[in-house]
Amino acid sequence: SGSSPSSNSNYCNLMMFCRKMTQGKCKLVNTFVHESLADVKAVCSQKKVACKNGQTNCYQSNSAMRITDCRQTGSSKYPNCTCKTTRAEKHIIVACEGKXFMP
């Protein structure tokens, strides 16, 4: 999506605000994946794993991907939503659905 994590610890606060993810309430957790859409879509044909919610349409990436993990801070209250920004390289799990099987 053209967004890449910088050394800026405000990355999560900025991105979640810009993408209107904090309208009406603070979002507890969000993960931004910094890989091409094609690479993320490809996960739907990789390793099938159990979903946390019991569904059976989750897939894990074969290789680690660059992510930014955003978690609401304990003192954060709407409308002043604040998040902790953590960068990592991890295998991602996506739920895939539809005819073309998209994440």
Swiss-Prot record:
Swiss-Prot/TrEMBL keywords: Disulfide bond, Endonuclease, Hydrolase, Lyase, Nuclease, Secreted
Cite a single Pfam family from the UniProt record.
RnaseA
Cysteines paired by S-S bonds = C12-C70, C26-C81, C44-C96, C51-C58
Q: Where in the cell is it found?
A: Secreted
Q: What's the Enzyme Commission number for this chain?
A: 4.6.1.18
Any one annotated GO CC term: extracellular region
Q: Could you tell me which InterPro entries the record lists for this protein?
A: RNaseA, RNaseA-like_dom_sf, RNaseA_AS, RNaseA_domain
Instruction: Give the chief site where it resides.
Output: secreted
- The entry's substrate-binding residues are K27, L28, V29, N30, T31, K52, R71
What SMART domains does the database record attribute to this sequence?
A: RNAse_Pc (SM00092)
GO BP: any one term:
defense response to Gram-positive bacterium
What's its catalytic activity? an [RNA] containing cytidine + H2O = an [RNA]-3'-cytidine-3'-phosphate + a 5'-hydroxy-ribonucleotide-3'-[RNA]; an [RNA] containing uridine + H2O = an [RNA]-3'-uridine-3'-phosphate + a 5'-hydroxy-ribonucleotide-3'-[RNA]
Q: Which GO terms describe its molecular function?
A: lyase activity; nucleic acid binding; ribonuclease A activity
Q: Its quaternary structure? A: Homodimer; disulfide-linked.
Q: What does this protein do?
A: This enzyme hydrolyzes both single- and double-stranded RNA.
Q: Which family does it belong to?
A: Belongs to the pancreatic ribonuclease family.
PANTHER family noted in UniProt: RIBONUCLEASE (PTHR11437), RIBONUCLEASE PANCREATIC (PTHR11437:SF24)
Task: From the Swiss-Prot or TrEMBL record, give the protein name.
Answer: Seminal ribonuclease
**Native source species:** Cephalophus silvicultor (Yellow-backed duiker)
